[in-house]
């Protein structure tokens, strides 16, 4: 998946490390969906 922005990464998207991963079929085990972005796309961040 592609990198995505997690709430824990900081207040803004620019200049911060993107620690999330964008998955197209939900999130893998040990991750959680940190943004509500539809039922099939998961903005997944480590728990």
Swiss-Prot record:
Protein name: Delta-actitoxin-Axm1d
MF term (GO), any: sodium channel regulator activity
Recorded superkingdom: Eukaryota
Subcellular location: Secreted; Nematocyst
InterPro entries, sorted: Anenome_toxin, Myo_ane_neurotoxin_sf
Species the sequence originates in: Anthopleura xanthogrammica
Keywords: Cardiotoxin, Disulfide bond, Ion channel impairing toxin, Nematocyst, Neurotoxin, Secreted, Toxin, Voltage-gated sodium channel impairing toxin
SS bond partners: 4-44, 6-34, 27-45
Residue ranges of the TM segments: none
GO biological process, one term: regulation of signal transduction
